[in-house]
């Protein structure tokens, strides 16, 4: 117990900031009259997330360390992923500030602090060094997300989204917990470093493989990869737009942090059946490759027929999860850099797109594709910004999305010849995605307007759009900025315990 109190709690400064802000805003929400706007609470939460991001950046020069008996790790991996999580959380909270559902907004206060609690869970996942802290952090993120999905309490679509999210999330949690129980049974410890060391001496390759598959299935539910993706379009469509944006970027980033922290740490050196390959993680690459290919194909093809903007971006997100999973299939130290860069770019272009969609939904009450028609004629800035985000999502040369995809593509073709097919699938599905992204661009610039002109973009959405556009342009035109940031993190050289 004395060791716990003597720990360096300043290592958790970003988490303390987010937790303190969430509790303070919860109390303020209870104290404010019910007819008082909760908009300032959202701005305060965004400021707290930005402050936590500054605290995280201030810790970058420090070396790797751990507290609480190695259950909480502050290494370069944790700092880098927290940076993305906090950036995505702050931008999503700006969308909450301007959320104006047609049912009214009596629950906006809950929206703000529940998003902060979800963000706290995601941050803890990135720093977890133990199965117990991983699981508790995952549940904090998951339960908060279920509430966010159902906050439009009088909207049937929101209630349906929350129910589907709870059911699928519960199944994923049960499967993952089952896999963790196998790992604990084989090693007798929950510490990730201890598990990795003891698994090198185990002679139960089949039990190990089963544990790996159970954990992979559980994480795949969270990432919405095929065939565990069916919940995502319905949840994205029914949830409030700011919550959808949060799920699309923060939850996905946290999921990949979990995938890397859990599976790579534990199974990178674990033995498999036979002598070649000797690593269980390497022996499972064919399965991961198939999942990645199917995810890219189904996400891209099904997106072609969508009329709802939120469902379209949901299937687009499934395809992007496939691109990221392809990087995981060709895992190397350089690929971890590529995955981090891809998630950073994905956060910027996705939040920017959702900010504009949030404005369209606020103004028209619908997220139908026709809401984009002729937007350039009366809101040229919005049309240009959304066009930029769509081009980047498509991976057009000269954009940040192209740089991010190129890194993963190169990683696939240089690791081993077996990944050439996966690289070809990535290239083909990227071309398929041009169809639905350019369909949206045609709507923006070349179709007549079917609805009344949109009002001016509110301050919160304007801030989010401008920041995302500047970030997307900066990385697209000067990718060295992202490389310099990766150099600050030491290219994750201290990732393994």
Curated annotation (Swiss-Prot):
Enzyme class: translocase
Localization terms from the record: Cell membrane
Keyword Repressor: no
A GO molecular-function annotation: quinone binding
GO BP, one annotated term: ATP synthesis coupled electron transport
Catalytic activity: a quinone + NADH + 5 H(+)(in) = a quinol + NAD(+) + 4 H(+)(out)
UniProt keyword list: Cell membrane, Membrane, NAD, Quinone, Translocase, Transmembrane, Transmembrane helix, Transport
Disulfide bonds: none
Protein's membrane topology: Multi-pass membrane protein
Superkingdom of the source species: Bacteria
Annotated EC: 7.1.1.-
TM stretches of this protein: 12-32, 40-60, 80-100, 116-136, 166-186, 208-228, 240-260, 284-304, 316-336, 341-361, 383-403, 430-450, 457-477
GO cellular component, one term: plasma membrane
Keyword Transcription regulation: no
Pfam families in UniProt: Proton_antipo_M
Family recorded in the similarity comment: Belongs to the complex I subunit 2 family.
Subunit structure: NDH-1 is composed of 14 different subunits. Subunits NuoA, H, J, K, L, M, N constitute the membrane sector of the complex.
Protein function: NDH-1 shuttles electrons from NADH, via FMN and iron-sulfur (Fe-S) centers, to quinones in the respiratory chain. The immediate electron acceptor for the enzyme in this species is believed to be a menaquinone. Couples the redox reaction to proton translocation (for every two electrons transferred, four hydrogen ions are translocated across the cytoplasmic membrane), and thus conserves the redox energy in a proton gradient.
Protein name from the UniProt record: NADH-quinone oxidoreductase subunit N
Source organism of the structure: Geobacillus kaustophilus (strain HTA426)
Upper classification of the organism: Bacteria, Bacillati, Bacillota, Bacilli, Bacillales
């Amino acid at each position: 117990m004395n060791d716990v109190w003597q720990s360096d709690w300043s290592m958790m400064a970003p988490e303390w900031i987010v937790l303190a802000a969430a509790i303070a805003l919860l109390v303020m929400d209870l104290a404010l009259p019910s007819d008082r706007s909760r908009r300032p609470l959202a701005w305060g939460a965004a400021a707290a997330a930005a402050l936590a991001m500054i605290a995280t950046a201030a810790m970058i020069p420090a070396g790797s360390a751990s507290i609480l008996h190695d259950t909480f790790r502050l290494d370069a991996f944790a700092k880098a992923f927290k940076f993305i999580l906090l950036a995505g959380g702050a931008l999503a909270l700006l969308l909450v500030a301007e959320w104006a559902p047609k049912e009214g907004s009596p629950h906006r206060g809950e929206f703000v602090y529940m998003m902060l609690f979800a963000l706290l869970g995601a941050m803890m996942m990135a720093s977890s060094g133990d199965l117990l802290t991983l699981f508790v952090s995952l549940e904090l993120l998951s339960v908060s997300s279920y509430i966010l999905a159902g906050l439009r309490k009088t909207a049937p679509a929101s209630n349906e989204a929350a129910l589907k999210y709870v059911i699928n999330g519960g199944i994923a949690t049960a499967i993952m917990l089952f896999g963790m129980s196998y790992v604990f049974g084989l090693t007798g410890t929950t510490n990730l470093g201890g598990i990795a060391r003891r698994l090198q001496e185990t002679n139960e390759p089949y039990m190990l493989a089963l544990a790996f598959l159970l954990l992979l299935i559980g994480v795949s539910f969270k990432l919405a990869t095929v065939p565990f993706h069916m919940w995502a379009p319905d949840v994205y469509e029914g949830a409030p737009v700011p919550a959808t944006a949060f799920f699309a970027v923060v939850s996905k980033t946290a999921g990949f942090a979990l995938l890397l922290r859990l599976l790579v740490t534990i199974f990178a050196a674990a033995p498999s059946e036979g002598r070649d390959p000797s690593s269980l993680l390497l022996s499972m690459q064919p399965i991961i490759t198939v999942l990645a290919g199917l995810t890219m194909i189904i996400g891209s093809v099904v997106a072609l027929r969508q009329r709802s903007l939120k469902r379209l971006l949901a299937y687009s997100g499934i395809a992007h999860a496939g691109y990221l999973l392809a990087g995981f299939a060709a895992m190397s130290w350089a690929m971890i850099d590529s995955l981090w860069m891809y998630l950073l770019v994905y956060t910027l272009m996705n939040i920017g797109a959702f900010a504009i969609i949030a404005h369209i939904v606020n103004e028209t009450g619908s997220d139908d594709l026709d809401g984009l028609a002729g937007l350039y004629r009366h809101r040229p800035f919005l049309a240009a910004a959304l066009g930029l985000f769509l081009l980047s999502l498509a991976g057009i040369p000269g954009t940040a999305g192209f740089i991010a995809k190129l890194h993963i593509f190169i990683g696939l073709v240089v690791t081993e010849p077996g990944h050439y097919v996966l690289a070809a699938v990535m290239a083909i599905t990227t071309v398929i995605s041009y169809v639905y992204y350019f369909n949206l661009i045609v709507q923006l610039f070349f179709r007549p307007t079917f609805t009344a002109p949109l009002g001016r973009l509110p301050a919160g959405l304007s801030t989010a759009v401008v920041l995302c556009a500047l970030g997307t342009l900066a990385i697209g035109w000067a990718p060295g900025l992202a490389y310099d940031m990766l150099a600050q993190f030491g290219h994750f050289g201290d990732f393994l315990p």
